[in-house]
Each structure stands twice: as structure tokens, then as C-alpha cells.
Swiss-Prot record:
Cofactor: Mn(2+)
A Pfam family recorded for this sequence: Sod_Fe_C
Designated gene of the protein: sodA
Classification via PANTHER family: 37S RIBOSOMAL PROTEIN S26, MITOCHONDRIAL, SMALL RIBOSOMAL SUBUNIT PROTEIN MS42
GO (cellular component) term, any one: cytoplasm
Protein name: Superoxide dismutase [Mn]
Length: 204
């Protein structure tokens, strides 16, 4: 939905991902961090009514066409809103814990199986210095790739469709895992919902 953007409801309680992701982290991450991205994105667009009918993906794809004074705010906060909206969907409790359907077939063909994809995504996440995301994305020709982006940059800015995103900002894990990013990444495989990923893949 376009402006005014709203913080999406999770659809599940903050404690639903315990013990892998703790309830306090989920609450702060959703209400405070994601909430701030939504507030700041709306503030950036407030004085530009002609942009208020655009979806956030469109704004991010065409950043350089936006007024110079809001480009950074839209990049950071629009990206943060889009990234987290996908992330919460992928963490929906239940569902398959490994790829299914058409996405499974594509992963098997292009990566040699789920284990190889997990290794690549984990490497991308561990290799991202500072804050950012690791992604499984689809290019315009249907091929899958593993990439990482800095800060809140979203793959749509590079012409990719995000399928799975893993948040490696410290706010995603620090209360429980402190500086142990590797432990967080090991845990997150227990809560990713691959039925949701399949829906996203088929719609991308």
C-alpha cells in the first residue's frame, strides 16, 4: 500500500519464535526499529504529494528521480520498511523448514540442493561487514542468486526480486546472541517458513 505507509501486523505473537529469536528482540525490532522506518518514510514524503501514490518498490527503483533532499531518507527508511515487511512474513510460525515446490526445484538445479544454498547464504551473511542483509533473489531472467546488501538497501534497487532475506543488523540478534552472528544465523534456519518463500517466488 502507498502513503501513508503503515507498520504491518505480524500476525503472530512476539514469543512465537522462541527459543531461536527471543520475544524482547522481536518486540523492539518490530515496534521500534520498523516503526521508525515507517514514520520517517512518511515524513520524507509528506511535502511531495505527487509521490504519495507510489509503492515503496517504485520509489526505491527510481531513487535518482526523487527530489535530492529525500533520496537518502527514502533509501534508508523505504528500504527498511520493505525489507522488514518481507522478513516478518518469512518468519511466520509453522510451514516447511526447507524449500518446497517450484522454488525447491530451482534451488536444486541452480545450487545443487538446500545444503549448498544454506552455506552460500550463511557466507553472504557472515561476510557482510557491519549492518546489512543476505538475500536469495531472482533476476529478470528467472535465475536465482545469493547476494548481500549494505544497510537497508533492497535488491529491487539492483533489478532483482527478493525471495528470502536475512537481517544481519545487530538489532536483529544482539539481545540474545550479542556479537555471535554465526549462532544467530544457525538458529534462523529453524524459523524460516519456506511455504511463504514459495509463494513469494511464484509471485516474483
Amino acid at each position: 500500500m502507498p502513503y501513508p505507509f503503515k507498520l504491518p501486523e505480524l500476525g503472530y505473537p512476539y514469543e512465537a519464535l522462541e527459543p531461536h529469536i527471543d520475544a524482547r528482540t522481536m518486540e523492539i525490532h518490530h515496534q521500534k526499529h520498523h516503526g521508525a522506518y515507517v514514520t520517517n518514510l512518511n515524513a520524507a514524503l509528506e511535502k511531495y504529494p505527487y509521490l504519495q501514490g507510489a509503492e515503496v518498490e517504485t520509489l526505491l527503483r527510481h531513487l535518482t528521480a526523487l527530489p535530492a533532499d529525500i533520496q537518502a531518507a527514502v533509501r534508508n527508511n523505504g528500504g527498511g520498511h520493505l525489507n522488514h515487511s518481507l522478513f516478518w512474513r518469512l518468519l511466520t510460525p509453522g510451514g516447511a523448514k526447507e524449500p518446497v515446490g517450484e522454488l525447491k526445484k530451482a534451488i536444486d538445479e541452480q545450487f545443487g540442493g538446500f545444503a549448498a544454498l544454506k552455506e552460500k547464504l550463511t557466507q553472504a551473511a557472515m561476510g557482510r561487514f557491519g549492518s546489512g542483509w543476505a538475500w536469495l533473489v531472482k533476476d529478470p531472467f528467472g535465475k536465482l542468486h545469493v547476494i548481500s546488501t549494505a544497510n537497508q538497501d533492497n535488491p529491487v534497487m539492483g533489478g532483482f526480486a527478493p525471495i528470502v532475506g536475512i537481517d544481519v543488523w545487530e538489532h536483529a540478534y544482539y539481545l540474545k546472541y550479542q556479537n555471535r552472528r554465526a549462532d544467530y544465523l544457525q538458529a534462523i534456519w529453524n524459523v524460516l517458513n519456506w511455504d511463504v518463500a514459495e509463494e513469494i517466488y511464484k509471485g516474483a
